């Protein structure tokens, strides 16, 4: 095959690995997003799946060229760029109430960030970190609010009883 068409040659082991990483990223983001859909939040499974997939795609984009070997600092800059850009997307999910005191959407913004981070870890092939991060995110999204509410009630009740004793 002529040299200018050599990029069409398939290396199925590498392509299978890339596909596995992209699927892992998409499914990790979708798992977090499904939780958001269940709780009727504005950013859900499709959005977070796409955010995670996009992050993995950016990380993997350099790996398809055998001639290119990225230095650790170059990968670090790509990750920093992803996370900064995702911060702007997450900021769009944060809303203030009419009186300006209530803030809504912070957890949704954080889920956009974790979906991006899961995409980065999947893109890098850090399988344990991708799975552990997905499970931890789901744990926090599922049980975080009830635990937070109980602890808040517990500590505000203790604070109130201490103030009453004074």
Task: Tell what function each PLM region has.
Residues 104-114:
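Short hydrophobic alpha-helical membrane-embedded segments
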Residues 136-146:
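Alpha-helical transmembrane segments and their membrane-interface exit regions
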């Amino acid at each position: 095959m002529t040299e200018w068409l050599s990029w069409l040659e398939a290396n199925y082991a590498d392509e299978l690995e890339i596909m596995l990483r992209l699927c892992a990223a998409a499914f990790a983001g979708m798992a977090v997003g499904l939780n958001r859909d269940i709780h009727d939040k504005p950013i859900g499974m499709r959005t977070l799946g796409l955010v995670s997939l996009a992050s993995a795609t950016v990380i993997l984009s350099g790996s398809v060229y055998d001639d290119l070997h990225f230095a650790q600092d170059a990968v670090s800059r790509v990750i920093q760029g992803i996370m900064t850009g995702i911060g702007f997307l997450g900021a769009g999910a944060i809303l203030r109430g009419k009186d300006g005191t209530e803030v809504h959407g912070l957890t949704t913004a954080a889920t956009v960030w974790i979906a991006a981070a899961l995409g980065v870890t999947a893109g890098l092939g850090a399988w344990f970190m991708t799975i552990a991060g997905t499970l931890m995110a789901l744990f926090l999204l599922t049980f975080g609010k009830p635990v937070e509410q109980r602890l808040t009630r517990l500590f505000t009740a203790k604070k109130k009883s201490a103030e009453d004793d004074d």
